[in-house]
Amino acid sequence: MDRGVPVDRFYIEHFLSSHAALIRGATLEVSENRYTKKFGGDRVSKALTLHVKNNADVIGNLVTGEGLSDIHVDCFIMTQTLPFIYESGKALKNAISLLNPGGFLLLTVPGITPISRFDMANWGQYWSFTDRSLRRLIEEIKDAKIVDLRTYGNVKTSMAFLLGAAQHELKPGDFEVFDPAYQLVIGAAVQRVASN
């Protein structure tokens, strides 16, 4: 039964909204371009979608780089994708390589999360993250500079998410407390810097 918009989407959208000015020029988004349209608006000159299998503008593999050699964008929106890629470090490195110098990767990952049955059956689900693990993955990429890395969540929203509650079942104030002990969503804005 679909109860409505999941709790974690509130935080994902809050993060993207706070970095909306970075969603500009040529953009790439995993699976669909919902957030590019919602937060990029007129700043976006070209909106591409990426998928490993089908129904996308770009069919490519973030781990191997296959199908991605001709892609260069100003912004790459990658929400809740890394948990489903076993070699997440390679995928993150290739994601950064798709950016034009000065471009931005807007990345979100789950911290506290249940298993997604659909994704587990189709790709596998391998990871949950913390702010420290995500920071370390990014810092291992020489051309990547973390501009912002923040956590979202608290005990109430984490419990609600695990129980399958929807956003409308919580009060607006429930989302205002960010407790680093309950990292439901971690967001990072990462800039590609020129190589030395």
Residue ranges and their predicted role:
Residues 1-21:
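Class I SAM-dependent methyltransferase Rossmann-like catalytic core
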Residues 2-3, 79-82, 120-121:
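Surface-exposed cleft-lining segments at the edges of enzyme active sites
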Residues 8-11, 57-61, 171:
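Short gly/ser/thr-rich secondary-structure transition/capping motifs
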Residues 10, 14, 71, 131-132, ...:
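A structural signal for well-ordered alpha-helical segments within the folded catalytic domains
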Residues 15-19, 65, 94, 137:
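A generic secondary-structure signal
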Residues 21, 41, 69, 180-182:
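Short, flexible hinge/linker loops that cap or flank conserved catalytic cores
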Residues 26-116, 190:
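Conserved SAM-binding loop
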Residues 89-90, 94-96, 100-196:
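S-adenosyl-L-methionine-dependent methyltransferase catalytic module, highlighting the catalytic core
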